[in-house]
Amino acid sequence: TVGNNVIMWAGNHIGHHSIIEDHCFFTSHVCMSGHCHIGSHAYLGVNATIRDFGEIAEGTFVSMDTSITKNITEPWGIYRGSPARRLKNVE
């Protein structure tokens, strides 16, 4: 399911039974496994990957080449790395 005002660039893979809430932005080549849930106002950078059953909280910024291996439950943060770690809050 894809919400309202979601922007997706070319080359993305969205797995089955995934939910993308409103106002999200996906750059190119984002790869989501099945059963993922992306909160509203999330931004996913180039080549970001999310494991199956992954959850991304509202307002999360995932930088390029970041691997989400654990659920991100704290909203409005910037994440980077493989595996992802929180760098700072979104202000």
Language model segments and positions:
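Histidine/lysine/aspartate-rich catalytic loop segments that bind and position anionic ligands
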Residues: T1-T27, S33
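Glycine-rich hexapeptide-repeat left-handed beta-helix
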Residues: E21-D22, T27-E91
